[in-house]
Amino acid sequence: MSHEGVIQFEGEHKRRELEARRYGELACELIAWREIMALTGLVGQEPGRYEGAGYGNASARIGPRSAAIGRRSFLITGSQTSGNRRIGLGDFAVVDGYDYRANRVRSHGCAMPSSESMTHAAAYDASPLVRCVLHAHSPVLWRRRRALGFPETDPSVPYGTPEMALEVGRLYRETVLPERQIFAMGGHEDGIVAIGRSAEDAGGVLLRWLARAYGTACGEGDGEVCST
């Protein structure tokens, strides 16, 4: 049974509209890249994938780089919104704070925050330079993750958990993640995460690696052209 998209943290969520004046511009940047991800099959919802569950999400930091760990607030696409063909500000939430040990997330917005909020939070805690996180689902990238040299989380660690958050921190400290800006989720089928200093930066990283993965697929000589 697929657990894709199921929230596994305790939430303190206040349901209220997000101010367009404060969050609208950043939301539009994320919506633009989410559209690109949808067109390339990196985010969405299909009957034949993951038992029909939605997949993929996007976030961006808000507030100063100097914010304390655990309080690096961010705007993130809402839970169960991956299958929506179009989204707006009402499909986002703001994560105001989080605690790995307590497995708790504080947030507000019309939508509940993504089930992967802990993973996004861990990327922001890893470095104040990280200002955007894009979580994609790509069979071609995931299958070629080792050939491409991606850092990879422990396959025994489930997604959306405090343990996954700790894994993300470990990858940032101990691997080439700061330079490559991308990692694979070893125990989360097709899960790929790109990080960057902006949505454009993270999106560019994701697309460059995707192009490289398709290029290696075409060069394998298996009779298929750019097979996923």
Predicted regions and their residues:
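Glycine-rich flexible loops
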Residues: M1-T228
